[in-house]
Structure formats: structure tokens, C-alpha cells
UniProtKB/Swiss-Prot annotation:
Keyword Oxidoreductase: yes
Pathway: Amine and polyamine biosynthesis; betaine biosynthesis via choline pathway; betaine aldehyde from choline (cytochrome c reductase route): step 1/1
One of the Pfam families matching this protein, by short name: GMC_oxred_C
Protein name according to UniProt: Oxygen-dependent choline dehydrogenase
Keyword NAD attached: yes
Alphabetical UniProt keywords: FAD, Flavoprotein, NAD, Oxidoreductase
Residues that coordinate or bind FAD: 7-36
Cofactor(s) it depends on: FAD
Any single biological process term in GO: glycine betaine biosynthetic process from choline
Example of a GO cellular component annotation carried by this entry: membrane
Reactions the enzyme catalyzes: choline + A = betaine aldehyde + AH2; betaine aldehyde + NAD(+) + H2O = glycine betaine + NADH + 2 H(+)
Length: 561
């Protein structure tokens, strides 16, 4: 075999690409090339390794592509942040470390589409378990020996977590002890991708650490893939930039595009696979007219409902520079303390209406008042709920703007384009205010800081959303799986109309899942890895899961409104 020839070439060492690299390299008779545009995941860089420092990578460009959207027409024409991970681990290197799998009905919904029948929740659950090591042990829902370490919430954490969960229950919503178990719906503790010694459990740490010493796996960082190379309709390799040089690598079997929901459609389009009219605008030679590439883009939008805290128990002191050396030292030496947690240790999922079949609103509770990216910190003790709708009907697109591989694409999520979006965000604000008025928070709850208690009408709440809602950093669905005219890949990630080419990442989701996307992305990569290797899929299980079936979304007689 030539030095630049491999059986598989994987483009993107993120949440999916690292899974594929590790699993494919388990077969000693194949060779794998893993290309990553960013650098290593430096283990001594607290910005990516300390869970509490999660805002730092979003503030620079070493680990963040720092995309911006086109002006969003329903959001006061704001150009909105669209951070994506750069470096070994991809977005698992810079995300919030919330381990949320989604709702069982998300996957049953995928499987309701013709040709996707093998994507039910009970087909996917074995792969969630395969990927996971949960710190309190395995059960029917959780794994005990997978590459991704999952930490559960422990006694003695910030008292605001328990108070906010209890307030949700007092407002009439269910309590759940496991947001990834039998019943996602309700309020409860949140699992996190954090190791036993308080480090971020990215897919680089979980998967590549197991695989990188294998002689059949080659990892190249600072490698910006320009385009996929084709012979007719077959992918035969890639061209990439590395330290100023243009290099080609040949793929004997397949090219696997794992660059994420923004960069995967961009790479396909730059390579000549996409909507022909878009490609002609930039004189990109057409390889295959596939109009769904870059379409169907989805995300979660969220807002911060913030309150003053009357007792000095919030994390506000940890934001003061003079307290941070001690926090960092405890974390570095012992892997404990404030630094060892992402501080998203409680949350929930609710249905805002009884006729919603599964939760349409997600909560993350945070014992400090601050933006996700570390900006706009409130200079007092405070706490907040991150509140966002889960399955917006609004759809956007990713569109190539240049043949330059270093140029950013045009990104439009088209946030809040549907009347349902506005109804759900108004409901979310009003329900959150009910939760915050419950007795469990009486000793902590001060005045409402944002949106502000004076904002009550639909028009006032809508204005707040337009000005203040932000991305939850969950882009997806832009190379969707399926068999309709706008589908890009089949049920195993193979690009329609092509040979030797797959897309495997969050872009192939037909519809966004209910919650954070890291765990589902790892799962789908595990599942497709078996198919690439020619292995039988793990057997469908019969584990029970909750379905509301018209049950009331809350017990209103118990709530303080």
C-alpha cells in the first residue's frame, strides 16, 4: 500500500469521527487516516480540561471555529453566534458536557420514516450503553465499560440545584431520577461527561486515548480538508492543506465525512455534491446534484431567566479573579471542588401543553447569573434557568460562499420563523416564573433580573426573545438521513447517488433530538461503525420507556401560581 493510501479516511476528529476512528482501527487488517483541522487537545490547558471553565474556549479561536449566522430575519436581524469545536474532540472539546440522550420518541419518530425502521429507541439504546461508563454502574439503560465517562450528581453540591428541582415538582411537574432512563420527562439531576478525576470526558480522551497507539491509525492535526476526490461517482480520496502544503490521500474503501452540521455540508458542496444551482454560482464543478445538502438545518434556541439570590450561596464569588487560583489549584491537584463540575447538575424536560406527545421545553439550572459564553455576568449573587424549545418547525440552511477551504459558509437557522416558536417561548417564560415562585425557592429568590417582572404581555416577551435569545450550540440535520427527495444519506450514512462516501455526524439526524446532541452523535457513530465494519447490529432490546399517551403534563392543583 502506498504511503498516502488508506482503507478509510475520516474527515473531522469530533464527537463522531473519533468514534469511527477508534472502532474501525480495532480491525488490525485495515488502515485509517483521521484528519483534523484543529490542533491537539492539550491536556494541561485548563480552558478545555476543567469543566467549570467551559466558557473559555468559546471566547477565542484556538478551539472554536467561531462561525456567525447571516442576519436572522426574525431576531432583529442579529448575526448570531454559532460556535463549533476545533481540535481533537471537536465540539466535545468545548461543549457544556451535559450528557443527555434525547427522548425515546425522538428515535421512534426517526424510525417512522420509510427506510429508517432500524433507528427506533430500542435499536439505539444498546449503542448508548456501549459508549458509556457511568460512575454509579451499569443497568438496563446505562453502560459500565464504554469509552465515555459519565458522572452523576452527588450529595453536597450547590443547594440551589435541589431547590430548583423541588420547585419544578411543586409547580406540578414530574420528578425523574434519571433524564436518560425510563422517563426523561420531569425535573431531576443531570449527568455530565466528566471523568472520575474531574476532567472533561471528550471523545478524544475517551476514544482516541484507547486507539491512538494502534499502528493502523494515523492522526493528522492542523489538516484542513479542501475537498473529497472522486472518480466518477466514487469517492477515492481527499485533498487537504497541511502546514502550507497541498496533500492528497487515497481511500481504498471509503471517505467518511464527520465534520459536523456546518462543515460537512460545506465540504460536500465544495467537492461538487449539492444543489446544482448553488454550486454553479461559485463555478464548482458538479459531481452530483443533491439538493438536500445544507438544507433542513436545525438548532435549539434558548434564553436565560435570571434571578437575584438572597442568600450568598451562588457561584458569584467564583467569578472573582482573586478566588480563581485556589479553585484551579484544588481542581489540578485533586480533581475536586467547583472546578470539577460544569455546574449544570440539574435540569428537566416538560410538556407545556397536555397534547404535546413528549417534552417540548428543556431546562438547565445554573447557580449563577451569566451568559453561556461567560459574557454579561450579573455582578451579584444570582441564579438562572436556561429555557428553550426542543423541536422548532423552523428550518435553515448552510450554503457555500467560497471555494476557499478556510472561508466560512453562509449559515441561516431562520430562528423563530414559525408561530409555534413564539407560543412555546412565551409559555416557557411564564411557566418558569411559576416555577420560581414555588416555596422551595422562597429563601433564595430575589427580584427577577431578566426578562424583568415588568415584561408581561406577549409583545413584551416576544421583544425580549428577539433581543436576548441565543443558540444552545446544537446545529444538526443539514445532511439528513432518509429516502425522500431532500434526504442526503441512507440509513447507514451513505450519500445517495455516490459510492464510497458517507456522512456520520449530527448533520444526518432527520430531526433534532430533545436535549443536548453530544450523546446522540456518539451513539449514531457507534451504530454506523458496526455497519461499516460489516458487523451485525447489536440486538434490539425490549427495555420499557415512558410514553405520556395524553397524561396531563402537570398537576396544577399542587402548584403555587
Amino acid at each position: 500500500m502506498a504511503a498516502n493510501e488508506y482503507d478509510y479516511i475520516i474527515v473531522g476528529a469530533g464527537s463522531a469521527g473519533n468514534v469511527l476512528a477508534s472502532r474501525l482501527a480495532e480491525d488490525a487488517d485495515v488502515t485509517v487516516l483521521l484528519l483534523e483541522a484543529g490542533g491537539p487537545d492539550y491536556r494541561f490547558d485548563f480552558r478545555t480540561q476543567m469543566p467549570a471553565a467551559l466558557a473559555y474556549p468559546l471566547q477565542g479561536r484556538r478551539y472554536n471555529w467561531a462561525y456567525e449566522t447571516d442576519p436572522e430575519p426574525h431576531m432583529n436581524n442579529r448575526r448570531m453566534e454559532c460556535g463549533r469545536g476545533k481540535g481533537l474532540g471537536g465540539s466535545s472539546l468545548i461543549n457544556g458536557m451535559c450528557y443527555i440522550r434525547g427522548n425515546a420518541l425522538d428515535y421512534d419518530g426517526w424510525a417512522a420514516h420509510a427506510g429508517l425502521e432500524n433507528w427506533t429507541y430500542l435499536d439505539c439504546l444498546p449503542y448508548f450503553r456501549k459508549a458509556e461508563t457511568r460512575d454509579i454502574g451499569a443497568n438496563a439503560y446505562h453502560g459500565g465499560d464504554g469509552p465515555v465517562h459519565v458522572t452523576t450528581s452527588k450529595p453536597g453540591n450547590n443547594p440551589l440545584f435541589a431547590a430548583m428541582v423541588e420547585a419544578g415538582v411543586q409547580a406540578g411537574f414530574p420528578r425523574t431520577d434519571d433524564l436518560n432512563g425510563y422517563q426523561q420527562e420531569g425535573f431531576g439531576p443531570m449527568d455530565r461527561t466528566v471523568t472520575a478525576n474531574g476532567r472533561r470526558a471528550s471523545t478524544a480522551r475517551g476514544y482516541l486515548d484507547r486507539a491512538k497507539a494502534r499502528p493502523n491509525l494515523t492522526i493528522v492535526t492542523h489538516a484542513v480538508t479542501d475537498r473529497v476526490l472522486f472518480s466518477g461517482k466514487r469517492a477515492v480520496g481527499v485533498s487537504y492543506l497541511h502546514h502550507g502544503n497541498v496533500l492528497n490521500a487515497q481511500a481504498r474503501r471509503e471517505v467518511l465525512v464527520c465534520s459536523g452540521a456546518i462543515a460537512s455540508p460545506q465540504l460536500l458542496q465544495r467537492s461538487g455534491v449539492g444543489r446544482s444551482t448553488w454550486l454553479r454560482e461559485l463555478d464548482v464543478p458538479l459531481v452530483h446534484d443533491l439538493p438536500g445538502v445544507g438544507e433542513n438545518l436545525q438548532d435549539h434556541l434558548e434564553m436565560y431567566i435570571q434571578y437575584e439570590c438572597k442568600e450568598p450561596v451562588s457561584l458569584y464569588p467564583a467569578l472573582q479573579w482573586w478566588n480563581q487560583p485556589a479553585i484551579g489549584l484544588e481542581w489540578m491537584l485533586n480533581g475536586t471542588g467547583i472546578g470539577a463540575s460544569n455546574q449544570f447538575e440539574a435540569g428537566g424536560f416538560i410538556r407545556t401543553r397536555d397534547d404535546d406527545p413528549w417534552p417540548n421545553i428543556q431546562y438547565h439550572f445554573l447557580p449563577v447569573a451569566i451568559n453561556y459564553n461567560g459574557s454579561n455576568a450579573i455582578r451579584m449573587h444570582g441564579f438562572q434557568a436556561h429555557v428553550g424549545s426542543m423541536r422548532s418547525p423552523s428550518r435553515g440552511r448552510v450554503k457555500l460562499t467560497s471555494r476557499d477551504p478556510n472561508a466560512h459558509p453562509g449559515i441561516l437557522f431562520n430562528y423563530m420563523a414559525d408561530p409555534l416558536d413564539w407560543r412555546e417561548f412565551r409559555d416557557g417564560i411564564r411557566i418558569t416564573r411559576e416555577i420560581m415562585r414555588q416555596p422551595a425557592l422562597d429563601r433564595y429568590r430575589g427580584r427577577e433580573l431578566n426578562p424583568g417582572a415588568e415584561l408581561t404581555t406577549d409583545e413584551q416577551l416576544d421583544s425580549f426573545v428577539r433581543m436576548r435569545a441565543e443558540t444552545a450550540f446544537h446545529p444538526s440535520c443539514s445532511c439528513k438521513m432518509g429516502y425522500d427527495d431532500m434526504a442526503v444519506v441512507d440509513n447507514e450514512g451513505r450519500v445517495h447517488g455516490m459510492q464510497g462516501l458517507r456522512v456520520v455526524d449530527a448533520s444526518i439526524m432527520p430531526r433534532i433530538t430533545t436535549g443536548n446532541l453530544n450523546a446522540p452523535t456518539i451513539m449514531l457513530a457507534e451504530k454506523i461503525a458496526d455497519r461499516i465494519r460489516g458487523r451485525e447490529a447489536l440486538a434490539r432490546v425490549d427495555t420499557p420507556y415512558f410514553v405520556a399517551n395524553g397524561v396531563a403534563s402537570r398537576k396544577r392543583e399542587s402548584a403555587t401560581v
